[in-house]
Amino acid sequence: MKKLFNNLPFRLLLGIIIGVILGQVFPESVMKVIVTLQYIMGQLITFCVPLIIIGFIAPSITKLGKNASRLLGVAIVIAYVSSVCAALMSAGAGYALIPHLSIDTEVAGLRTLPDVVFELNIPQIMSVMSALVLSVLVGLAATWTNSKLTCDFLGEFQNIVLDIIGKIIIPMLPFYIAATFCNLSYEGMITHQLPAFIQIILIVMAGHYIWLAVLYLLAGAYSGKNPWEVLRYYGPAYLTAVGTMSSAATLAVALDCARKSKVLRKDMVSFGIPLFANIHLCGSVLTEVFFCMTISKILYGHLPSIGTMLLFCALLGIFAIGAPGVPGGTVMASLGLITGVLMFDDAGTALMLAIFALQDSFGTACNVTGDGALTLMLTGYAEKHGIKNNDNIQSPVL
């Protein structure tokens, strides 16, 4: 029994179940405490995200040496191609399926969550994108100048971050996820809004699994390795993403899952997973495209033209690379495209945000799980091009 409770996937599932049940029975007075605890834990996790990014990407780049610039370019290209192809697949499914769906536009109202008892703001030392850019620039500059002092410092900083992950973030995650689902259950989002859009959500989730299968099959074919040896370890990361709705907040668990795989090079994991958590949002892109087409049909009576959707998908792939890996980050970053390319009005934008929020957790889980496939591609690329293996980073013990 003790071994079972020490298992991270079990603790995450238990947190989800307990959170949903308690959200149905807790009064407003107790929910004030839950909302406050969830807020504080979320603040702490969010604060640590830039540290995790810097602690893994920068030292990983220094260990890649002269190959750093080339690998960074390869990573960005495959992340963009994955997102755009997922968007195009979603658009094709939209043209084929949406005209035949009977979608109810009436959405039940939600209860309002009580305010937090007190606010404890823990602002990040920098934004996620700033941390990503800083990591890349410092890592590349340290490599170009052969700065041993900087490289050693980054290695020590990585060890510090690993301890923060293993001793603070991961033990706290089940409680954070339980509080999150308690809030959703109390609001009524789980019991009322989800059934209203169950058709399109199920279709989108099926699209997630189809695209993940495509990614892992392509990664396996290119690398010559068994993709199941990566995917089989991603259960905890998938569940964490469902609970946090954030690729960035799931980063700690995703790193540990990927490092358990025997077919992934550890240097590629330390370089690729934190990078892809911020630039590879294939699940969110796939979801947004299908939902935009659905809302266009509901509110405006027609689907966008093929030319419009091709432009939207191509631009959305670029916006996804720059979108923050936080809840709703993709749709928030692309609001300009939704209003400028698809010509959505305020009603369309509001409905898009509401529906997207219902399944944001599963889109995020697709993003995170897809990162493993792209890291397998990076591993294959490194081995095919004779890039030296720097497998000397220890993983946190969960």
Predicted regions and their residues:
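Membrane-water interface of transmembrane alpha-helices in multipass transporters/channels
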Residues: 33, 69, 73, 190-198, ...
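Short amphipathic alpha-helical coupling elements at transmembrane boundaries
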Residues: 35-46, 152-167, 232-240, 256-263, ...
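Membrane-interface alpha-helices at helix entry/exit sites of multi-pass transporters
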Residues: 69-75, 166-170, 261-277, 303-307, ...
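Small-residue-enriched core segments of transmembrane alpha-helices in multipass membrane transport
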Residues: 75-84, 158-161, 197-214, 233-241, ...
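Alpha-helical membrane segments and immediately flanking helix-loop junctions
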Residues: 233-289, 317-331, 358, 362-377
